[in-house]
C-alpha cells in the first residue's frame, strides 16, 4: 500500500495537505520547505512543478511559478534536489504539474525519476482522461505511479 493510501486509511481525524511551488521563493529552498512542513505536522505535500502557462491556476500560483522559473527551476533540477528526500521525509509527496514540461522531459523518464525520488502520485490537470487511458496509463502503472 502506498503512502497516500496509508494516510487515508489511518483513521487520522485531521489531515492537512499543503501545496507549494518548487523553486519559490528560492531555487535551493525546496527540500527545506518539505522538511519544515513535515516537521510542523503537515500530512501530505503537493509539490508544484512550475510552468510558464499555468492556465488552471489562480494568480498566486501563477506568480509563484513565474518566480520559480526566473529562479531557474526545472524538472531536471527538481529531481536532483529530491533524489535523497526519502532519507529525511516520510509523508506522501505528490507532484502537480502541467503536461507540457512532463512531455518535454519524457513521460517514461518522468515516471522513472518519480520512483527514484519516492514521489507517491502525480496530478496533471491538463491531461485528458482519454489520453491518459490510451497513451500514459500503461507507463504510469509500470512504474507504480498514481496519476
Locate each region found by the language model.
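Active-site mouth loops of central-metabolism enzymes
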Residues: 16-30, 94-106
Amino acid at each position: 500500500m502506498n503512502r497516500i493510501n496509508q494516510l487515508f486509511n489511518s483513521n487520522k481525524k485531521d489531515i492537512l495537505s499543503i501545496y507549494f511551488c518548487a523553486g519559490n521563493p528560492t531555487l535551493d529552498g525546496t527540500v527545506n520547505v518539505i522538511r519544515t512542513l513535515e516537521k510542523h505536522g503537515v500530512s501530505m505535500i503537493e509539490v508544484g512543478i512550475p510552468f510558464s502557462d499555468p492556465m488552471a491556476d489562480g494568480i498566486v500560483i501563477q506568480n509563484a511559478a513565474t518566480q520559480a522559473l526566473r529562479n531557474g527551476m526545472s524538472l531536471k533540477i527538481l529531481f536532483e534536489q529530491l533524489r535523497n528526500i526519502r532519507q529525511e521525509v516520510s509523508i506522501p509527496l505528490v507532484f502537480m504539474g502541467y503536461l507540457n514540461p512532463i512531455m518535454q522531459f519524457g513521460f517514461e523518464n518522468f515516471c522513472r525519476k518519480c520512483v527514484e525520488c519516492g514521489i507517491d502520485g502525480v496530478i496533471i490537470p491538463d491531461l485528458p482522461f482519454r489520453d491518459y487511458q490510451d497513451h500514459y496509463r500503461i507507463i504510469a502503472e509500470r512504474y507504480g505511479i498514481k496519476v
